[in-house]
Amino acid sequence: MASSSSSSHRRLILAAAVLLSVLAAASASAGTSCVPGWAIPHNPLPSCRWYVTSRTCGIGPRLPWPELKRRCCRELADIPAYCRCTALSILMDGAIPPGPDAQLEGRLEDLPGCPREVQRGFAATLVTEAECNLATISGVAECPWILGGGTMPSK
């Protein structure tokens, strides 16, 4: 009877360990998904929105560029390196996060007299040394797929 109890106890511990491993893996992968609401906040980079439109089109709040840049860079730095270019893509083109009531979010608005391609070109450089000096997963100094060049790497 003791060996039967011991065997049941071992099976229970093994099952619990497997369950914990599965939960840990699911939790880790959820934290690394570059989608709004997970590794990227919903409607990401509001300060970068202002910084991009201010620098490219002269539209935005009456804050000096260095202050807008500081805020933008802080928001971008808070996003994991492997999601920064994705966050900038969402800034330009938007994304529909997972969920039953999900709607397009994060997209920089079309502004009269402010060409979208000019904004896109500047947004692609926000991770560069001249702007925020931040690392990305691509290993290049900017996010070229925002401009339509290359494909976005996955983690």
UniProtKB/Swiss-Prot annotation:
The keyword Secreted applies. The active site is at R62. One of its GO terms (molecular function) is serine-type endopeptidase inhibitor activity. GO terms for cellular component: extracellular region. CDD domains: AAI_SS. Residues 139-155 form a propeptide. SMART domains: AAI. It holds the Pfam family Tryp_alpha_amyl. It is found in: Secreted. Coiled coil: none annotated. Disulfide bonds join C34-C83, C48-C72, C57-C114, C73-C132, C85-C143. Residues 1-28 form the signal peptide. The sequence heterogeneity suggests that 2 genes exist for this inhibitor. The genes may be alleles, or multiple loci could exist. Potent inhibitor of mammalian trypsin and a specific inhibitor of factor XIIa (activated hageman factor). Monomer. Belongs to the protease inhibitor I6 (cereal trypsin/alpha-amylase inhibitor) family. This is Trypsin/factor XIIA inhibitor.
